[in-house]
A protein has these predicted regions:
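N-terminal pre-domain/capping segments
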Residues: 1-108
Length: 110
């Protein structure tokens, strides 16, 4: 069965995107009431995601995490794997490893 997912900005991603940013309680309670089952987390930096808070709020509102996306990282810090700058690519690879580790922390969340 198809489950609805909605993009939500991590707390450190203060940028205008096609995603909902702000207080997790406000966002997650609305998404839950509208029938959403999961959120897509848009992050700026894998090291600054408040894992305990996010896990607690996802569980409180019975929501899962469908994916982790890097739009804010690319738009705010210009970090991406295809950069012509080798230093930027190295930073992107470091962040990619952080994303994998971050994703593993949510394996048991709904």
């Amino acid at each position: 069965m198809l489950e609805l997912s909605y993009p939500v900005l991590a707390l450190d991603a203060d940028i205008k995107m096609m995603a909902w940013g702000g207080d997790y309680d406000v966002i997650f309670s609305k998404l839950q009431s509208w029938g959403y089952k999961k959120v897509e987390l848009l992050i700026r930096n894998s090291d600054t995601v408040q894992v305990d808070l996010l896990t607690e709020k996802l569980q409180e509102y019975n929501l899962g995490l469908s994916q982790i996306a890097t739009g804010p990282m690319q738009r705010m810090d210009h970090i991406f794997l295809m950069s012509p700058d080798s230093l930027v690519r190295q930073t992107a690879v470091k962040q990619l490893y952080g994303l994998i580790e971050l994703g593993s922390k949510f394996a048991g969340v709904r």
